[in-house]
Every structure is written in C-alpha cells, then in structure tokens.
Regions:
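Conserved alpha/beta-domain cores
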Residues: 1-249
C-alpha cells in the first residue's frame, strides 16, 4: 500500500521514476525507513509492531516451489524480528509455523519486544528517498505488471479480492502498483533499460503480447479492457476499483 501511495503521489514529479516492481523490495531506502519508523512509533507508545504479509504461498503439487516459499518467508520474518517487530502475518496456513518459529526463537521466551525502542531518528526526507541503486525498467517487468493487473482485475470482477498469481497471494495493492507504474512509465515517456521509449504504440504492443498468453481465460476481455483503460487514460483514477464497480453484474 505504501509503495502504491508513493507512486501515485509522485507519478508526475520530475526526476522520480520507479523501476520494476520486483526491484522495490523492503530493503530499499524509503521502505526500510518506513518500517523502522513503524517499530519505533509503536514501541514508544507500548503498542505491538506487526510486520507485513509474506505473499509467498506453497504449492502442494510442486515441492521445489514450496521449498522456495518456505525459505523466502523464513528470511522475510527473520528480517522483521531482527528489526524489532513483535509478530507478523502470512498468506497461507502452511506458513504459520515458519513465521511462529522465527519469532519464538528471536524473542527467546518473551511475548514481544515492546521494551526495545530503537533510536532510528527517521527524518521526512528518508521516507521520500526513492533512489534505488542499479534499478531499471525491463520488458519482463512491463509484461509482468500487465499480466498481474489483468488477472487480478479478472479475479476481482468475479468476486475474489485476493488472487493466487504465480505462487504469490496478491491483493488490490499489487494490482495498484502494477497499474500506477505502467501509467507513470507511459505518461512520462520513460525509457526501458534497452533505450526503448514507452509510448502508446509500445504499450499497445506490450498489452497484445501479454494478452495472447491469457486470452483463453473465460470472460477475460472485460478485465483486459478495464485495466488497459486505467493505464492509458490521461486522468489517473485514485483507485482501480472505483470505475470497476460499474462492471460488476
């Protein structure tokens, strides 16, 4: 949600262009600053600091994917526990024990670590430091945003607010990040890592390429057209769900 908010509010600010969604991790400067501020703010007031949701989900038909999900969640929760969080949440019941074990080991018998009040001294500028080293905008990132956006919109229009996409549990925030990034790249004529300018013809071709892979999904056309409209419209809709409500049967 914070990533989406950052992109939305800075989408037309000169000099601020966000890279591929996969490159905006919890360890980049502005995300690290906000999580540190969260822990400090909560503990100063005697409140629990709860970490974010790990979107990774296991695949019981694919042990390799499941093992990778377990490892990712473990690393994610270890980072949170080390920062000072008191607990966290996950996207799938099979991951509860992993999350619990990490926090139990780190807390060493304590119910929480509220007594730990870090002195991070977060300044406003740190929350707006969007510099990400060695970042780029790739064709893979563009195609992924389009595909995730269309598939999530399709899921949402069919009554599912959370969708399992590519072994991740995605909600509206992911679709909003995808949509707002595509909008920013298109309406600011940003260049990809290969020097290609993202204009309307470029984006049209990208949509066609992605749609050719998913056009056999039932009733996918409505989702495609709505998501595409949100990307191409000059006016930036505050939330993608607002115009989509009119499409619900």
């Amino acid at each position: 949600d914070y990533i989406f908010s950052a992109i939305k509010r800075h989408r037309n600010v000169e000099g601020i262009i966000f890279p591929d969604r996969s490159q905006i991790t919890m360890t980049v400067p502005f995300m690290k600053a906000y999580t540190e501020l969260l822990v400090e703010s909560c503990h100063k007031r005697g409140a629990h600091a709860i970490g974010g949701m790990s979107a990774f989900i296991p695949n019981r038909k694919d042990p390799e994917i499941t093992e990778k999900a377990f490892e990712n969640v473990k690393n994610d929760k270890l980072r949170e526990a080390t920062m000072g969080f008191d607990g966290s949440w996950v996207a799938h019941p099979d991951l509860v024990s992993i999350c619990k074990d990490v926090f139990s080991e780190h807390l060493n018998g304590e119910a929480n670590q509220i007594s730990f009040v870090p002195g991070y001294d977060i300044e406003d500028s740190m929350l707006h430091n969007f510099e990400i080293e060695n970042s780029s905008i790739t064709m893979e990132g563009i195609h992924t945003n389009i595909k995730v956006g269309i598939l999530y919109m399709h899921s949402w229009l069919n009554g599912q607010g959370a969708a399992a996409l590519f072994n991740l549990m995605e909600d509206a925030a992911t679709a909003e990040i995808s949509r707002s990034q595509l909008w920013q790249w298109l309406h600011n004529s940003v260049e990809t890592e290969n020097g290609e300018t993202i204009n309307e013809s470029f984006m049209e071709e990208a949509f066609e390429t992605v749609f050719s892979d998913i056009n056999d999904i039932e009733n996918i056309e409505k989702a495609r057209e709505e998501f595409k409209k949100l990307v191409f419209d000059e006016d930036f809709s505050d939330f993608l769900t607002l115009p989509a409500y009119h499409l619900i049967n």
